[in-house]
């Protein structure tokens, strides 16, 4: 399993139309859902 990198997570979420991304338990979570 790949460790979550906040910068990558955040930009992936933004590219998918979310406001921001945050790493929780090594997984990328996009907000707001």
Swiss-Prot record:
<comment type="similarity">
    <text>Belongs to the short scorpion toxin superfamily. Potassium channel inhibitor family. Alpha-KTx 10 subfamily.</text>
</comment>
<feature type="disulfide bond">
    <location>
        <begin position="9"/>
        <end position="28"/>
    </location>
</feature>
<dbReference type="GO" id="GO:0090729">
    <property type="term" value="F:toxin activity"/>
</dbReference>
<dbReference type="GO" id="GO:0005576">
    <property type="term" value="C:extracellular region"/>
</dbReference>
<dbReference type="GO" id="GO:0008200">
    <property type="term" value="F:ion channel inhibitor activity"/>
</dbReference>
<comment type="function">
    <text>Inhibits less than 5% of human voltage-gated potassium (Kv) channel Kv1.3/KCNA3 currents at 100nM concentration and does not block human Kv1.1/KCNA1 and Kv1.2/KCNA2 currents.</text>
</comment>
<feature type="disulfide bond">
    <location>
        <begin position="4"/>
        <end position="23"/>
    </location>
</feature>
<keyword id="KW-0964">Secreted</keyword>
<keyword id="KW-0800">Toxin</keyword>
<feature type="site" description="Basic residue of the functional dyad">
    <location>
        <position position="22"/>
    </location>
</feature>
<keyword id="KW-0528">Neurotoxin</keyword>
<keyword id="KW-1015">Disulfide bond</keyword>
<keyword id="KW-1220">Voltage-gated potassium channel impairing toxin</keyword>
<dbReference type="InterPro" id="IPR036574">
    <property type="entry name" value="Scorpion_toxin-like_sf"/>
</dbReference>
<keyword id="KW-0632">Potassium channel impairing toxin</keyword>
<protein>
    <recommendedName>
        <fullName>Potassium channel toxin alpha-KTx 10.5</fullName>
    </recommendedName>
</protein>
<feature type="disulfide bond">
    <location>
        <begin position="13"/>
        <end position="30"/>
    </location>
</feature>
<dbReference type="GO" id="GO:0015459">
    <property type="term" value="F:potassium channel regulator activity"/>
</dbReference>
<feature type="site" description="Aromatic residue of the functional dyad">
    <location>
        <position position="31"/>
    </location>
</feature>
<dbReference type="Pfam" id="PF00451">
    <property type="entry name" value="Toxin_2"/>
</dbReference>
<keyword id="KW-0872">Ion channel impairing toxin</keyword>
<dbReference type="InterPro" id="IPR001947">
    <property type="entry name" value="Scorpion_toxinS_K_inh"/>
</dbReference>
